[in-house]
Amino acid sequence: MPTQKTVVLVALIGGLIATGCARLPYQTTTLYQGQRAAVVLQQEVEPARYSHPAQLRADEIGAILRGFSIRAQQRLPLRWFAEERPPDRLFHEDELLVIAPLLAEGLQKAGPEERVHFSLFAPGQNRSESRTVTSGWVAVRGPYLYLTVEYLHAEVPIRSLDAYYPNNPSLPPLPGAYLLFFEPGRYWVMERGGARALEFREFLKGAPLVVPRPGQARP
């Protein structure tokens, strides 16, 4: 008959296994895969109740994303030095021309439990082995648009050699921790659930819209 210590040990191991195997959103549909960008739909594992499909035009998406800036989240004392300079723009104009139409399509095709995941690619330090990636996801719920950034100009390997070698340079880096900002700041709010979100409908009422010229927005 198992002792009390054995039962406690088994329960502890089971809890660690369950924690280590936490479910993550998973890909359901690839909407676009190219040299400069990729956009996929991801299924949430917890009820999300997004307002998808959402009707947003590419110029509206561009205006929204143009307002975001970003800074890597630092621990003290590095945070003091980081806060002395303004955050960087999240997207350059050429990136907006690529990603805005794809995100507009993604939001129109996503379901209520799906988010739209995006990746932007640029050549890495060694073009044959790595590329620079900016990635994250967007979703809409009611009056709010949610944006999360996972990688910001991160060097990510293209090829995988031996995933079991602990110092293998081909393993992708862990997602980063970032602070997002938006201008005008009055639209970047804390919603009822405690998450940062953009009151995008209110913002779009007075936002300047830039319509891409034909042939500009080629991924």
Question: Which residues make up each language-model segment?
Answer:
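Sec-dependent bacterial lipoprotein signal peptides
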Residues: 1-19
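Bacterial Sec signal peptide processing site at the extreme N-terminus
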Residues: 15-39
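Short acidic/polar, Gly/Pro-enriched loop/turn segments located at secondary-structure boundaries
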Residues: 53-57
